[in-house]
């Protein structure tokens, strides 16, 4: 409990930001779902066959896993709030639509006949007594939708829409139960609060209910005003990073350097996703900059993959020229350290089976179980390369990056992929096996951005190239350890390092 409170106090500012994002997304989704579902239900009430079809279709959408729905929208809408909002609205429509139709159909037919006898139009009947009588049932559907929205909105973090899910995702990545609890408990409390508020509104008069939702819409609009005004004052760059502490540290370094040396501001989007996710987001303009590694560019982004040597300078030149020609992306100068892929095993396993090189795994491939990330498992410079170059046919379970270290620590797996600067190698006493057949190319990190952005702001090259040739492997490993193991803020670690190196004044 003490650790939970300390973590909450340390990250209170981040929590307020995440809570605000979650509230904005949830409230906007709920209001849009109400505006779509209730008028549709009023229309479908008099078209029973069509109503059955629409309800079935809406119900089918609810059976689609939310993560799959988000993934389907990314190619069409990019990343960020729009695909998250669209997916959440689709999920929220069904309970509101169903309850509104049920509520309207449950009205005593004699009241309908009396209204017609008094010469009331359909709209007058709806306004005078049908909606008021059906309102308790309608509000019940709205409450169900609200709870559903708030819970599902935690997944919006995976596509860059922010929210309380960022704490959960970060907690999983850092193996930090306090962060997970902060995100989960906040989401649960928010759902309970929404449910209570809507329950109170349910008992109010119709005009009071409408006024309540109008007030919500007004407050929602006002909450977006500061961000819109800030964007007009200064150009804001979106700097994203892959999952893990290292990309977040590098992204914060870029942000700090840009804000000190230019008139622009920058927002960091950490734990944004895998390589392909960030690459597509960059090309579509959903993000502006992210740190990418030379070997990843040559092996995964360039199509077809060029044949390169294992000389770092040559790999960088091929990556820089190839990505510029293929996608009109600018790849600035790399840092010094190599963060290559690696295959690691616990030291006691290495000693027990005499494992020193990746080739040595051949003699134990039937005895040991491997845990790889989805990305490593599908890459030519990953498990596919282990199969083709080393002839390995390992028993592989795929999992999220942070979970593989927990799995190897608990003994569920004995082999894992890693990055050579991962703090977990030291934390869990792992031994990196020698890449004796040189499967993994050099991996040096450098900022990747659109050529159009660099042409518009040429000062970015000068500012970000101050990191070129800087940061050794031991320094990067230590920075990762501070964030991943000691739990320090990536922004603070990045700031302290830049100040120590004389790259940042304040």
From Swiss-Prot:
- Subcellular location, record wording: Cell membrane
Specify the taxonomic lineage.
Answer: Bacteria, Bacillati, Bacillota, Bacilli, Lactobacillales
Q: Which SUPFAM superfamilies match?
A: MetI-like (SSF161098), Periplasmic binding protein-like II (SSF53850)
Task: Locate the region Ergothioneine binding domain.
Answer: 231-506
* Main location class: membrane
| Gene disruption phenotype | Lacks detectable ergothioneine. Cellular levels of glutathione (GSH) and cysteine are unaffected.
Q: Which domain of life is it from?
A: Bacteria
Q: Name one GO cellular component term.
A: ATP-binding cassette (ABC) transporter complex
Report domain ABC transmembrane type-1 positions.
19-198
User: Domains: what does the record tell us?
Assistant: In EgtUBC the transmembrane domain (TMD) and the solute-binding domain (SBD) are fused.
Question: Which family, according to the similarity comment?
Answer: In the N-terminal section; belongs to the binding-protein-dependent transport system permease family.
Please name the GO terms that the record assigns under molecular function: ABC-type quaternary ammonium compound transporting activity
Pfam families from the entry? BPD_transp_1, OpuAC
The consequence of residue 244 to F is: Disrupts ergothioneine (EGT) binding. Binds EGT 100-fold more weakly. May have a global impact on overall structure
Q: Which organism is it from?
A: Streptococcus pneumoniae serotype 2 (strain D39 / NCTC 7466)
Subunit annotation: The complex is probably composed of at least an ATP-binding protein (EgtUA) and a transmembrane protein (EgtUBC). Probably undergoes significant conformational change when bound to ergothioneine.
- Keyword field contains Transmembrane helix: yes
Which Cys-Cys disulfides exist here?
none
Q: Which UniProt keywords apply?
A: Cell membrane, Membrane, Transmembrane, Transmembrane helix, Transport
Q: Which PANTHER family match?
A: GLYCINE BETAINE/L-PROLINE TRANSPORT SYSTEM PERMEASE PROTEIN PROW (PTHR30177), OSMOPROTECTANT IMPORT PERMEASE PROTEIN OSMW (PTHR30177:SF4)
Q: How does it sit in the membrane?
A: Multi-pass membrane protein
Listed name of the protein: Ergothioneine transporter EgtUBC
What residue ranges are annotated as transmembrane?
23-43, 49-69, 70-90, 148-168, 178-198, 209-229
Q: What InterPro entries does its record include?
A: ABC_Gly_betaine_transp_sub-bd (IPR007210), ABC_transp_perm/SBD (IPR051204), MetI-like (IPR000515), MetI-like_sf (IPR035906)
Q: What does this protein do?
A: Part of an ABC transporter complex EgtU required for the uptake of ergothioneine (EGT), a natural low-molecular weight (LMW) thiol antioxidant. Responsible for the translocation of the substrate across the membrane. Also contains a C-terminal periplasmic solute-binding domain (SBD) which binds to EGT with sub-micromolar affinity. Binds L-hercynine about 10,000-fold less tightly than EGT. Cannot bind the structurally similar compounds L-histidine, proline-betaine, choline, ectoine, carnitine or dimethylpropiothetin.
Entry keyword annotation includes Transmembrane helix: yes
* GO BP annotations, alphabetical order: amino acid transport; glycine betaine transport; quaternary ammonium group transport
């Amino acid at each position: 409990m003490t650790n939970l409170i300390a973590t909450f106090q340390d990250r209170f500012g981040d929590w307020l930001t995440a809570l605000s994002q979650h509230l904005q997304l949830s409230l906007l989704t709920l209001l849009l779902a109400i505006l779509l579902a209730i008028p549709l239900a009023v229309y479908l009430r008099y078209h029973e066959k069509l109503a059955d079809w629409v309800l079935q279709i809406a119900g089918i959408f609810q059976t689609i896993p939310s993560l799959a729905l988000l993934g389907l929208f990314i190619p069409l809408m990019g990343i960020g709030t729009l695909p998250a909002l669209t997916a959440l609205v689709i999920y929220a429509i069904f309970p509101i639509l169903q309850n509104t139709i049920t509520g309207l159909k449950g009205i005593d037919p004699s009241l309908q006949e009396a209204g017609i006898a008094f010469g009331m139009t359909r709209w007058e009947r709806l306004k005078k007594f049908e909606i008021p009588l059906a309102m308790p049932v309608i509000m019940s559907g709205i409450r169900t939708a609200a709870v559903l929205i708030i819970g599902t909105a935690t997944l919006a973090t995976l596509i860059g829409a922010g929210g309380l899910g960022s704490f959960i995702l970060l907690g999983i990545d850092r193996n930090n139960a306090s962060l997970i609890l902060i995100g989960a408990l906040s989401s649960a409390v928010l759902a309970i609060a929404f449910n209570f508020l809507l329950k109170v509104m349910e008992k109010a008069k119709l005009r009071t209910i409408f006024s309540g939702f109008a007030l919500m819409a007004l407050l929602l609009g006002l909450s977006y005003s500061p961000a819109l005004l800030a964007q007009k004052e200064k150009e804001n760059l979106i700097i994203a990073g892959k999952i893990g502490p290292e990309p977040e540290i590098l992204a914060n370094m870029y942000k700090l350097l840009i804000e000190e040396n230019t008139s622009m501001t920058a927002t960091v989007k950490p734990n944004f996703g895998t390589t392909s996710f960030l690459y597509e987001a960059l090309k579509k303009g959903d993000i502006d900059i992210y740190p990418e590694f030379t070997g990843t560019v040559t092996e995964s982004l360039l199509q077809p993959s060029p044949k390169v040597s294992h000389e770092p300078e040559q790999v960088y030149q091929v990556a820089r020229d190839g990505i510029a020609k293929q996608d009109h992306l600018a790849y600035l100068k790399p840092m010094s350290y190599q963060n290559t892929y690696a295959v690691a095993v616990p030291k006691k396993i290495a000693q027990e089976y005499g494992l020193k090189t990746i080739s040595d795994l051949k003699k134990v491939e039937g005895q040991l179980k491997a845990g790889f990330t989805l990305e490593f498992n599908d890459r030519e410079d990953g498990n596919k390369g282990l199969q083709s170059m080393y002839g390995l046919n390992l028993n592989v379970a795929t999992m999220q990056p942070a979970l593989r270290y927990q799995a190897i620590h608990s003994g569920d797996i004995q082999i894992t992929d890693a990055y050579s600067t991962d703090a977990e190698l030291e934390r869990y006493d792992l031994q990196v096996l020698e890449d004796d057949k040189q499967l993994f190319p050099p991996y040096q990190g450098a900022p990747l951005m659109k050529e159009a952005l660099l042409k518009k702001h040429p000062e970015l090259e000068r500012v970000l190239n101050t990191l070129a040739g800087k940061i050794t492997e031991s320094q990067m490993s230590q920075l990762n350890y501070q964030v991943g193991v000691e739990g320090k803020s990536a922004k603070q670690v990045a700031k302290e390092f830049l100040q120590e190196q004389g790259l940042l004044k304040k």
